[in-house]
Structure formats: C-alpha cells, structure tokens
Design a protein with these regions (language model features):
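Conserved beta-strand-loop-alpha-helix junction that forms the acyl-donor binding cleft
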Residues: 93, 119-129
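Acetyl-CoA-dependent GNAT
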Residues: 10, 24, 29-91, 102-103, ...
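Short aromatic/hydrophobic contact patches that present stacked aromatics
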Residues: 4, 83-87, 118-120, 159-161
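A short beta-loop-alpha structural element at the N-terminal edge
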Residues: 4-18, 163
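C-terminal "cap" of GNAT-fold acetyltransferases
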Residues: 82, 145-177
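Conserved catalytic-core motifs of GNAT/GCN5-like acyltransferases
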Residues: 118-121, 133, 138-155
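Conserved GNAT acetyl-CoA-binding A-motif
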Residues: 109-121
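Conserved acetyl-CoA-binding loop-helix of GNAT-fold acetyltransferases
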Residues: 94-107, 111, 130-134
Length: 177
C-alpha cells in the first residue's frame, strides 16, 4: 500500500469529509469538534490560513487514508506548545502510516521552534497511545468523562506530552541528531 503525504489544501475539503465520515465516531471524539460536519472543515481551513493549524494528509489513489495536524496558538502563554492530532483509516493502522504522519508533523513543529507537543486520545485507544509513546510521548494527565458521544456515553481522555527540547538535548548528548 502506497501513499503520499502532503499539505492539506482547500480543494481537499470533500475528500476530508468523506474520510472523516468513514471513521467510527469514537475515533473522532478527542478532536473536540465533529469533522463530519462541513462547517467544521471550513473552520479548520480558516485556521490553516490564519497560521494556527498546520495540517498534512496522506492520500492513496485520490482517497485520504490519514491526516495529522499541529494546532498552535502563537499569541497565547503556551505559544511554545503544539497539539498534535492524528487520524488513520482503520485498514491502514499498524502499517507505519501513523508513524510517518507523526514524523512529518515533528518536522513542522521543529520548523516552528516548538518546545513541547501534546496529544489527546480516549484511554481505550491503546494502539494510538503505544504509537505516541514509541515516539517519546509520555502520559501527563487523564481527564475523566471528558468527551461524550452521540450515544450519551462519556469517555476518559488521556493527555500525552513530548518534551522536544529535552529529547533534542538527550539526542545531542548521545551523538544522535
């Protein structure tokens, strides 16, 4: 299975809607907004134009199979922190696509000079948690009953963080760049 990773463009709107609608609702809960709604995609694209979100997509034969975003607030007290959001099609999980998207987002974060990255996911998304931890993220918090699906069921949210500066310093000290 091959794919191309590139920047999310305005004309990718319909493909993103189709991709989001192909995912189970549970996979979208950590986002805070329902990507299956056109106005949410439009707001996302507006945030890209404003420079608050950098977004990458993975496409295969014209279909989206994954997405990664780096959400920042350059005007806040936490301008040094970026929030990473990752979505991978169910049939592409465990094959390296998520890792490739995250590594591409790491490069974007480095270009912005970010010191810390965070990621949120429901606590039962064990594959996602394992992937993020394999790339240096560590659990920092668990928010009980933080998100609620349309079925009314609440879910706990895990907050993971990656200290970019500490990892960079450790890598330099051990001769890894």
């Amino acid at each position: 299975m091959s794919y191309t990773i590139r920047r999310f463009q305005p004309d990718d709107r319909d493909a993103m809607l189709a991709f989001a609608r192909s995912l189970p609702e549970h996979d979208l809960l950590f986002l805070g907004r329902d990507l299956r709604r056109p106005r949410v995609i439009e707001a996302w694209q507006g945030a890209i134009v404003e420079g608050r979100i950098d977004s990458l997509i993975a496409s295969d034969g014209g279909s989206l199979v994954g997405s990664a975003a780096l959400v920042r607030d350059p005007l806040s007290w936490s301008a040094h922190v970026g929030e990473v959001r990752l979505l991978v099609a169910g049939d592409r999980r465990g094959a390296g696509l998520g890792r490739d998207l995250l590594e591409a987002i790491f490069a974007v974060a480095a270009a912005h000079g970010l010191a810390k990255l965070t990621a949120a996911m429901t606590t039962d998304q064990l594959g996602s948690i394992a992937l993020f931890e394999s790339l240096g993220f560590r659990a920092e918090a668990m928010l009980k009953d933080q998100v609620r699906g349309r079925d009314g069921v609440t879910h706990d949210l895990a907050i993971l963080a990656h200290d970019v500066e500490r990892t960079t310093q450790r890598n330099r000290a051990s001769g890894v760049e």
